[in-house]
């Protein structure tokens, strides 16, 4: 009899609950953009792109109800337990639009959810009274809603200023200005980039001060050594050279497969001995360079660093959804620092507003629509801001950039990767892929946070001699060390000899070795995964154009780290053809005493 009574009571409560179910018309969450709670998906060129909510980042909850006149509460659930509850503000208190522009909505209640609540597998329920227990049978409640919350990740960025051709703190900008982006800039970047947090600090190398730069063959021009910025053959030549150096630094520090970014402010002198502006920027592959101001050039190039193309070109190719690289059709943005919504139209205090009708896309109300930051829209922002906004679609590229990276967990001393199916990190053990063809241990270091010297050098097969240089050595108090092979060690050579199962020398051969002499006359030999051979032929013919001055095959730029336990007396680049056969007949190609 008691069981029957309990059954009837439960069914009665369910009927009441169904009759009193709060009717919710729309639920959205806003971080960089206001998107549906289930995320947003695009299908372009037979490729599906999806934008999720980022975990461990605060989010503005917007909800519209059939009855606008009631007060509502939201409860956040995780593992079938309430982790928090808040009262929603009525629609009149929805955050304002930048520059007091048109309101986003007059129907949405809203509340800012703390970052600790934004986690995978969270659930949302709306009620008319505050929920303080874990009962899901509250009268006057809604169904559950299930936000698509994905990876939480911290964007780490190094800044590494380049002072070139005599540039210094006095005749250009002081290191205190160029060495980092500052907390206020970081706060605004957090509102524009899809990430949980940002750590932006000066690189362990601190800065690079070089009187010259060796430019690789480029655009039909041979390699050349330059000592002032006016000697460059094209506007991007120096910036391209800097990016190539950053590639070597990232690899030497074991960061090539990480999501760690690096940006280098470029300060150099012209032929007149005065500062010359770089005249733009260049970025890609987790690297960027440009001027020292950390404004639109920096913002644009770091978009490239995370994999974003120029939006106009992408639209023309069918891989960007909004006309001419604009934001027409993109969701509105949100800035939690200012607690205001960002329309997709150019605000009146923007420098671009006055003349925007000359070349803008217009919305249905005749307003000038913002362009993507990646297509000339870097200035389409309210005067209170430093940066404009990306399109919602571009956040998918940024999110994927982080999903595909390897992360080092400093607290555990282990690596991890993200599983987008389970919505969780898993411990990852780096391994050597493709038998070492493209490197060892997923490009991760074998030692961390030790004092290192970074040695960067160039070599030209055709000369003149000045093109083969060992740059001034750089020292870091906290650097990383990569696994390497010593060509004087027979056991090491057995591991990479062609035919042993290793493909370490199959990309272009193993024909070069760096020899470092320390102040106690001890030696260290580091075999480079670099050679003169054709692909997949480590003992065969030399590459085409190996001795063509205008071909990149005639030029080498490489960088390595070595332990800084002793001072360096000399660095040499040796020609060690098929090094696994022995290097007793090595030829010294480049040598420099320190």
UniProtKB/Swiss-Prot annotation:
- Species lineage: Eukaryota, Amoebozoa, Evosea, Eumycetozoa, Dictyostelia
Task: Supply the source organism for this entry.
Answer: Dictyostelium discoideum (Social amoeba)
Q: How is the cofactor bound?
A: Binds 1 zinc ion per subunit.
The entry's family comment says: Belongs to the dictomallein family.
Sorted alphabetically, which keywords does the UniProt record give?
Hydrolase, Metal-binding, Metalloprotease, Protease, Secreted, Signal, Zinc
* Cellular localization per UniProt: Secreted
Looking up SUPFAM superfamilies in the UniProt record yields: Metalloproteases ('zincins'), catalytic domain (SSF55486)
Signal sequence, start to end: 1-18
The EC number(s) this enzyme carries: 3.4.24.-
> Residues in the active site?
301
Q: Which gene encodes it?
A: dtmlD
Q: Where is the Peptidase M66 domain?
A: 147-408
Pfam families cross-referenced by the UniProt entry: Peptidase_M66
> Recorded GO terms, molecular function?
metal ion binding; metalloendopeptidase activity
Q: What is this protein called?
A: Dictomallein-4
Q: Which cofactor does it need?
A: Zn(2+)
Which cellular component terms (GO) are annotated to the entry? extracellular region
- Where does it mainly reside? secreted
Q: Kindly list the biological process annotations in GO that this record carries.
A: proteolysis
Against InterPro entries, the record matches this protein to:
Dictomallein, Peptidase_M66_dom
């Amino acid at each position: 009899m008691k069981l029957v009574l309990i059954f009837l009571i439960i069914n009665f409560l369910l009927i009441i609950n169904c009759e009193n179910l709060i009717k919710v018309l729309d639920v959205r969450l806003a971080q960089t953009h206001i998107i549906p709670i289930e995320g947003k998906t695009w299908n372009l060129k037979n490729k599906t792109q999806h934008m999720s909510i980022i975990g461990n980042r605060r989010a503005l909850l917007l909800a519209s109800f059939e009855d606008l006149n009631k007060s509502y509460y939201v409860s956040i659930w995780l593992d079938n337990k309430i982790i928090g509850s808040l009262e929603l503000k009525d629609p009149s208190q929805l955050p304002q639009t930048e520059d007091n522009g048109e309101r986003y909505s007059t129907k949405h209640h809203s509340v800012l959810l703390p970052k600790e609540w934004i986690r995978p597998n969270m659930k949302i329920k709306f009620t008319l009274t505050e929920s303080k227990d874990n009962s899901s049978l509250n009268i006057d409640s809604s169904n559950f809603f299930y936000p698509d919350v994905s990876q939480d990740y911290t964007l780490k960025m190094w800044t590494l200023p380049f002072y070139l051709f005599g540039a210094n703190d006095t005749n250009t900008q002081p290191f205190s200005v160029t060495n980092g982006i500052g907390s206020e800039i970081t706060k605004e970047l957090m509102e524009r980039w899809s990430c949980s947090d940002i750590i932006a600090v000066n690189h362990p190398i601190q800065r690079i001060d070089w009187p010259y730069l060796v430019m690789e063959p480029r655009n039909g021009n041979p390699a050349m050594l330059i000592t002032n910025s006016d000697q460059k053959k094209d506007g991007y030549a120096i910036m391209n050279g800097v990016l190539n150096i950053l590639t070597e630094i990232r690899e030497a520090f074991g960061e090539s497969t990480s999501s760690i970014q690096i940006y280098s402010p470029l300060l150099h002198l012209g032929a007149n001995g005065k500062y010359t502006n770089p005249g733009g920027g260049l970025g890609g592959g987790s690297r960027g360079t440009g001027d020292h101001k950390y404004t639109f050039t920096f913002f644009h190039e770091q978009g490239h660093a995370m994999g974003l193309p120029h939006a106009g070109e992408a639209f023309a190719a069918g891989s960007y959804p909004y006309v001419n690289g604009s934001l027409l059709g993109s969701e509105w943005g949100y800035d939690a620092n200012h607690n205001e919504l960002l329309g997709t139209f150019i605000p009146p205090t923007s420098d671009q507003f006055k003349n925007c009708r000359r070349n803008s896309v217009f919305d249905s109300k005749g307003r000038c629509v913002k362009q993507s930051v990646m297509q000339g829209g870097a200035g389409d922002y309210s005067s209170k801001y430093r940066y404009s906004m990306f399109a919602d679609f571009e956040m998918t590229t940024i999110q994927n950039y982080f999903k595909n990276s390897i992360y080092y967990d400093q607290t555990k001393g282990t690596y991890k990767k993200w599983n987008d199916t389970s919505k969780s990190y898993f411990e990852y053990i780096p391994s050597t892929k493709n038998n070492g063809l493209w490197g060892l241990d997923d490009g991760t270091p074998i030692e961390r946070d030790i004092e290192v010297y970074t040695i960067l050098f160039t070599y030209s097969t055709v000369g003149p001699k000045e093109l083969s240089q060992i740059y001034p050595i750089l020292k870091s108090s906290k650097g990383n060390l990569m696994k390497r092979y010593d060509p004087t060690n027979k056991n090491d050579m057995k591991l990479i000899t062609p035919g042993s199962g290793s493909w370490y020398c199959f990309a272009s051969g193993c024909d070069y070795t760096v020899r470092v002499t320390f102040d106690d006359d001890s030696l260290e030999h580091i075999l480079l995964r670099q050679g003169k051979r054709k692909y997949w032929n480590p003992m065969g013919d030399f590459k085409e154009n190996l001795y063509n001055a205008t071909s990149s095959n005639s030029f080498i730029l490489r960088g390595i780290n070595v332990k800084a336990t002793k001072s360096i007396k000399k660095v040499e680049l040796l020609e060690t053809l098929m090094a696994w056969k022995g290097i007793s007949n090595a030829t010294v190609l480049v040598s420099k005493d320190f």
